[in-house]
């Protein structure tokens, strides 16, 4: 089996309804997977039931069987029994903390490596990389490790934008990612803009959507990745 992982920048683009823009990206992963487990651990400011209801409504057109992992007495067994895994956005630190708490990090990696489809957005995409060291989120809780699912061998930065409001004197996103590359010049970071996604199918990695992505690695800073690019070279360990 091969990895089949869709890594969305966000749950919305502009003023579109929840997950509406992502339906064309998500649908191919659901052809042979109807029973999905949703992991809402990144949701801190809402109940898990409320979060689950939003996802079920947003994906209702696909007619999937979606349950929340919080509804199951054994989270590990729930992941094993599902045809696919959904992880939503919110706070990445809280998400990873809970994944470690329930001993799910290794299990999810193993299940996805065996071919179980994975769909994440925002924080759910952050945890798909090597670590969460390039998240935008506030560290409201300390997970045992920053090491993440390693579904792709690089770092992600969802919601990427280098916009700086006039008069604002804080660092831009590009400056923050430059800091990462100064500490770790060998690990690539891909900034994915809202409305876009990365799709890994085995040894193939594609950029989906109508927005470019941006690469940061060593001396390479904010290098545009054109719409529709094949990024399979980022999966090679030699990078």
UniProtKB/Swiss-Prot annotation:
Its main location: cytoplasm. InterPro entries: Class_I_gatase-like, Peptidase_S51, Peptidase_S51_dipeptidase-E. The keyword Metal-binding does not apply. GO terms for biological process: proteolysis. The active site is at residues 122, 137, 159. It catalyses: Dipeptidase E catalyzes the hydrolysis of dipeptides Asp-|-Xaa. It does not act on peptides with N-terminal Glu, Asn or Gln, nor does it cleave isoaspartyl peptides. Its EC number is 3.4.13.21. GO terms for cellular component: cytoplasm. Hydrolyzes dipeptides containing N-terminal aspartate residues. May play a role in allowing the cell to use peptide aspartate to spare carbon otherwise required for the synthesis of the aspartate family of amino acids. This is Peptidase E.
